[in-house]
Amino acid sequence: MSLAVVFLLGFLAVSHGQQAGTETEEYHLPLTWERDGSSVSASVVIDSNWRWTHSTEDTTNCYDGNEWDSTLCPDADTCTENCAIDGVDQGTWGDTYGITASGSKLTLSFVTEGEYSTDIGSRVFLMADDDNYEIFNLLDKEFSFDVDASNLPCGLNGALYFVSMDEDGGTSKYSTNTAGAKYGTGYCDAQCPHDMKFIAGKANSDGWTPSDNDQNAGTGEMGACCHEMDIWEANSQAQSYTAHVCSVDGYTPCTGTDCGDNGDDRYKGVCDKDGCDYAAYRLGQHDFYGEGGTVDSGSTLTVITQFITGGGGLNEIRRIYQQGGQTIQNAAVNFPGDVDPYDSITEDFCVDIKRYFGDTNDFDAKGGMSGMSNALKKGMVLVMSLWDDHYANMLWLDATYPVDSTEPGALRGPCSTDSGDPADVEANFPGSTVTFSNIKIGPIQSYD
């Protein structure tokens, strides 16, 4: 998930490689959540990709705009040695990143104009302690949270999801990474993102290509791949939950074909980029979610996801909603030729939705529900983010995509195919926000 931030002032540091600078003391934003009925006092850390990347010797920017400094970074090894990331203090959370928290409530703002910076979107991870991410084991568990997506227009995505990041952010694997989870290192997902400034403890500067439509981002030769369980990708118009699997275990750097980049290599990589998705609008239930819908995006709602095994491996990912004192079962769908409707993600559902929509079943090819089960058993890190889409304008979530298609499954939401241009949403909807709260994990409950 590609997000962007630009800073106009650097910080002083005295470290080498993907290590933490010492000028600014790191502060993690407090956030409470609930495990098995007991409150947990925890915190979140901001992704290292949002941090200032600068020379270890002075305040010279290693990364400026969407390019690496050619003197400090003539090659990746030299860049890794010359450049460092720095801490985020308490005031920077709100003033620079537009992120605030109170109790169990976390609010992410879209565009934040700080004294020295303009921040676009954000991505944070839940911590277990100062140096490690919280690892969630979701099999035979129920995960729930409240979300207010009412202030997210077409083209934005307020997401909550799990990925197979390393608990320590990669410090035990990569000797050049000593910043670790404390500084938000080690992000990965099933898209094998190339926009990470550091991957596997090394600067991703080799082959770096600045984006032609994002003044803050670019792509390097390396990508960072891992399993991804999208619990919630949504704005006020559309939503989905999606399982993505990979043929590799855990955090895996990639290059070349293994990254499965868009185009001819998309299905040749190590991860399933399409995923097996359950999206009510795409499945024909156009009145189920949205402003004034059965699940009304105009007010806060509770999202419940159950990971059911039946005593074995994962066999069902079930979705339930609560709003206004009512329990709302997930929208059901019938595919032609099926006797019984589906209302959850199962192996059979994934086969049938790919068949009906004519999509490549890369989910099955990369491991299917068994692969997802293995990833959940090993544990995953919780991510919350707000972003716009410089590749496809978020049309895959809330509009018709591909834009000229009339085939089943192309209609994914009510938004116009002209919507979602990042330049437009950043200029016209800078005050957009998403709020997550009341995060809980516990035994599976009955909601009949």
From Swiss-Prot:
Its main location: secreted. The keyword Signal applies. It is an enzyme of class 3 (hydrolase). Keywords: Carbohydrate metabolism, Cellulose degradation, Disulfide bond, Glycosidase, Hydrolase, Polysaccharide degradation, Pyrrolidone carboxylic acid, Secreted, Signal. The modification Pyrrolidone carboxylic acid is found at Q18. Its EC number is 3.2.1.91. The keyword Signal applies. It comes from the Eukaryota. It catalyses: Hydrolysis of (1->4)-beta-D-glucosidic linkages in cellulose and cellotetraose, releasing cellobiose from the non-reducing ends of the chains. Disulfide bonds join C62-C83, C73-C79, C154-C415, C188-C226, C192-C225, C246-C271, C254-C259, C276-C350. GO terms for cellular component: extracellular region. GO terms for molecular function: cellulose 1,4-beta-cellobiosidase activity. Highly expressed in the hepatopancreas (at protein level). Little or no expression detected in the hindgut or the rest of the body (at protein level). InterPro entries: ConA-like_dom_sf, Glyco_hydro_7, Glyco_hydro_7_sf. The active site is at E228, E233. Optimum temperature is approximately 25-45 degrees Celsius. High activity is maintained over a wide temperature range. Residues 1-17 form the signal peptide. Optimum pH is 4-6.5 for p-nitrophenyl-beta-d-cellotrioside (pNP-G3), and 4-8 for p-nitrophenyl-beta-d-cellopentaoside (pNP-G5). Substrate binds at Y97, D119, I120, K197, D230, I231, W232, E233, H244, R266, D274, W396, R412. GO terms for biological process: cellulose catabolic process. Pfam families: Glyco_hydro_7 (PF00840). Unlike most wood-boring animal species, which rely on symbiotic microbes for digestion of woody substrates, the L.quadripunctata genome contains a range of enzymes (including GH7B) capable of lignocellulose digestion. Belongs to the glycosyl hydrolase 7 (cellulase C) family. Monomer. Exocellobiohydrolase (CBH) that catalyzes the hydrolysis of 1,4-beta-D-glucosidic bonds in cellulose to release the disaccharide cellobiose. The degradation of cellulose involves an interplay between different cellulolytic enzymes. Hydrolysis starts with endoglucanases (EGs), which cut internal beta-1,4-glucosidic bonds in cellulose to reduce the polymerization degree of the substrate and create new chain ends for exocellobiohydrolases (CBHs). The CBHs release the disaccharide cellobiose from the non-reducing end of the cellulose polymer chain. This is Exoglucanase GH7B. It comes from Limnoria quadripunctata. The gene is GH7B.
